[in-house]
């Protein structure tokens, strides 16, 4: 029955996996996106891109979040990824290139902004182990019911996480 759907908070993005019978899976939240430059990147695309690169480089991620970085000088704007790895990849630059490549495959608007030299490819900031826990503790939201948003269309989380990264 559809009784369970009435308990859903509006804002979930769902995908139908079957129409007979009707079956859906939750693939994200409408408020978790980045479109600071018109790219309309959603959580499903980001998670896919990161997962593929992690498999390719044999690394695992504890936690991550992504935010836009709007440049105020000659440098182009980009997406800034804050990632806490179990063990970082040996070649972080190559890893970032693969994540970016997968994201371009999934999102044509993002690809157009990169190929049109509007945006620079994404940049990764490595968050030391425990960095996200420290962040959640610092905002009073440490606990199982609270999660770090994967995507933010602003820099509220990113600006705090900068102080926890190994590359300031």
Identify the role of each PLM range.
Residues 1-168:
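AMP-binding adenylation
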